[in-house]
Amino acid sequence: MTKSVTVKDLKERLNLELICSETGLERPILTSDLSRPGLELTGFFSYYPEDRVQLFGMTEISFSEGMEPEERLKRYKQMCTKRTPAFVISRNLEVPKELVAAAKEADIPVLRSRLKTTRLSVYITNYLESRLAPVISMHGVLVDIYGLGVLITGSSGVGKSETALELVKRGHRLVADDNVEIRQEDELTLIGSSPAIIEHLLEIRGLGIINVMTLFGAGAVRSSKKITIVVHLENWDPDKHYDRVGLDQEKTKIFDMDIPKITVPVRPGRNLSVIIEVAAMNFRLKNMGYNAAEQFTQDLNNLIGHNSSMND
């Protein structure tokens, strides 16, 4: 699932000036890629990415000023197709009247920005990539723990929300409860957030729905967070083998990404919030180059080797 974005959304997000064709602001933008139509101004249309936002900078405007008005109008009309979402002019450059005429005829918005072309292209691309990223919904709770986005999963009633509440009381921040919307912004980044209708809310069985921001303040919540690790809670199974050393690293797949996963068995007497908090701290430590399990194994092997040599 992807969220739709219109030219109007882009205009409002980047505070762009509308030059013409207000009725065309509802045109959809289907790709985050931009087009700098330099070759098209020379008449080369063998490959014209018509479905992209067409960005004009100093180069395109300066080149078009050297063309005859009739030829300039012809080129702009060729650029105006049913799939073209908008034309954007950078640097507050003067918009060619032929472009305005062609865009009005095709009902395509022409927008203008004060920003330099390179910076404007970065802002547009980043915004569109974020809005057009594929999105899925997952059942779970997302909490920011020591700067790491920890997605807590598990079956209904296992204690995810109660654990999140305890983590918030310990100074961490809630991102989403029950329904986590996850979007893949690029090949290495998953961003989790909450649906607007349940943002900052936490459902506790026997207590009901509470507003975390109202109870604990603005510092106890955040709107989105990059997902770094998944902690899966499951009821303790006495017949199942659970990792006791920490050498093996589980993975779980979200979209096409493998995310580190820790399975935590749940049974009375276990303080889940502390376990998850320490799991996040230990994960950070591993990323910094220290692995307690590997160090223990190495020390144990050294001790065994030393004792063996002594016996020999």
UniProtKB/Swiss-Prot annotation:
A single GO molecular function term of this UniProt record: protein serine/threonine/tyrosine kinase activity
Pfam families documented for this protein: Hpr_kinase_C (PF07475), Hpr_kinase_N (PF02603)
Region (Important for the catalytic mechanism of dephosphorylation): 265-270
Entry binding sites for Mg(2+): 161, 203
UniProt: ATP binding residues: 154-161
Catalytic activity: [HPr protein]-L-serine + ATP = [HPr protein]-O-phospho-L-serine + ADP + H(+); [HPr protein]-O-phospho-L-serine + phosphate + H(+) = [HPr protein]-L-serine + diphosphate
This protein's UniProt keywords: ATP-binding, Carbohydrate metabolism, Kinase, Magnesium, Metal-binding, Multifunctional enzyme, Nucleotide-binding, Serine/threonine-protein kinase, Transferase
CDD domains documented for this protein: HprK_C
Entry EC number(s): 2.7.11.-, 2.7.4.-
Active-site residues, record numbering mapped to chain: 139, 160, 178, 244
Required cofactor names: Mg(2+)
Region of interest (Important for the catalytic mechanism of both phosphorylation and dephosphorylation), residue spans: 202-211
GO biological process terms, semicolon-separated: regulation of carbohydrate metabolic process
HAMAP family tied to this protein: HPr_kinase (MF_01249)
Role played: Catalyzes the ATP- as well as the pyrophosphate-dependent phosphorylation of a specific serine residue in HPr, a phosphocarrier protein of the phosphoenolpyruvate-dependent sugar phosphotransferase system (PTS). HprK/P also catalyzes the pyrophosphate-producing, inorganic phosphate-dependent dephosphorylation (phosphorolysis) of seryl-phosphorylated HPr (P-Ser-HPr).
UniProt note: domains: The Walker A ATP-binding motif also binds Pi and PPi.
Subunit field text: Homohexamer.
Similarity remark: Belongs to the HPrK/P family.
General remark: Both phosphorylation and phosphorolysis are carried out by the same active site and suggest a common mechanism for both reactions.
Protein name, UniProt field: HPr kinase/phosphorylase
Organism the protein comes from: Listeria welshimeri serovar 6b (strain ATCC 35897 / DSM 20650 / CCUG 15529 / CIP 8149 / NCTC 11857 / SLCC 5334 / V8)
